[in-house]
Amino acid sequence: MSTLLNIDATEIKVSTEIDDIIFTSSPLTLLFEDQEKIQKELILESFHYHYNHNKDYKYYCNIQGVDENIQSIDDIPVFPTSMFKYSRLHTADESNIENWFTSSGTKGVKSHIARDRQSIERLLGSVNYGMKYLGEFHEHQLELVNMGPDRFSASNVWFKYVMSLVQLLYPTTFTVENDEIDFEQTILALKAIQRKGKGICLIGPPYFIYLLCHYMKEHNIEFNAGAHMFIITGGGWKTKQKEALNRQDFNQLLMETFSLFHESQIRDIFNQVELNTCFFEDSLQRKHVPPWVYARALDPVTLTPVEDGQEGLMSYMDASSTSYPTFIVTDDIGIVRHLKEPDPFQGTTVEIVRRLNTREQKGCSLSMATSLK
């Protein structure tokens, strides 16, 4: 199994409806009703695929009284992400698994997720799809500075790998090695792109970008980006929660440090190792769920969907993965909202509020895992 999967974005074959949506459509042109229709069709198709090709998942469905003749995607059994910490669940044949990716593992046991080539290609497609919220850029119009390792150094740690995939889409300079930030190289790379007259995109974990801002302040380094720079964060603050800034204060820090024209130039990405898709923000900093993913907020006790806009336990069904059934319930409390006309960015958004913090709430999810062991 190789962690150094060689993907050429120009050679990916678009052969199915889901691939057509992921690789060729734009999130800016799909109406909410169209997205909902696509979602139901693709999620049902994914369920039938995993039900018929994964005996462990089929068993899990059957003991809950569910067979392949379901009528609604809400009837699809979901399982807790904690299951991936204790079981190697995969639909793809072992010979087709490119790598077992792991969570960043801020504490405790790490999750292990199998991915085949098609799943990884579709993950890349979700990055390209989400980047369209920034605008339509040709390769020669935009260059990136990534405060992380390239994909050959990211190994199997998931979010480092996800963030490194941008190098397949645009010219990218990487300025972190072995978790050591080269601040001088980062600033030189930003200035080099600016001199070329190209659009700039700075990418990294929020804490690394926070450290860059403080480095620039300490060394009296100014960078007047104006309207020609995007900053994309991802991965959260992890073990640096004590130093974490709220979104408003973080936005303000970046606005001042880089002399940005507008807060819409700052975006955040959501992803987790058990999910095969990245959620990008629109210009209003709302994280959008692509139409091949079904997101719900569930009551932590009954595991039934709560009202639109209410807090609940986050659950996702992701049709893009062929290597494992992505029908999961997480340890995040969040809010799902549905945006319809006349909103300029129609679709479904998610807002992650916090992690579960009580044994009682976690027990609701963990008890489900025993059925798969």
UniProtKB/Swiss-Prot annotation:
Pfam families: LuxE. One of its GO terms (biological process) is bioluminescence. Its EC number is 6.2.1.19. Pathway: Lipid metabolism; fatty acid reduction for biolumincescence. It is an enzyme of class 6 (ligase). InterPro entries: ANL_N_sf, LuxE, LuxE_bac. It comes from the Bacteria. It catalyses: a long-chain fatty acid + L-cysteinyl-[protein] + ATP = an S-(long-chain fatty acyl)-L-cysteinyl-[protein] + AMP + diphosphate. Keywords: ATP-binding, Ligase, Luminescence, Nucleotide-binding. GO terms for molecular function: ATP binding; long-chain fatty acid--protein ligase activity. Disulfide bonds: none annotated. Belongs to the LuxE family. Acyl-protein synthetase activates tetradecanoic acid. It is a component of the fatty acid reductase complex responsible for converting tetradecanoic acid to the aldehyde which serves as substrate in the luciferase-catalyzed reaction. This is Long-chain-fatty-acid--luciferin-component ligase.
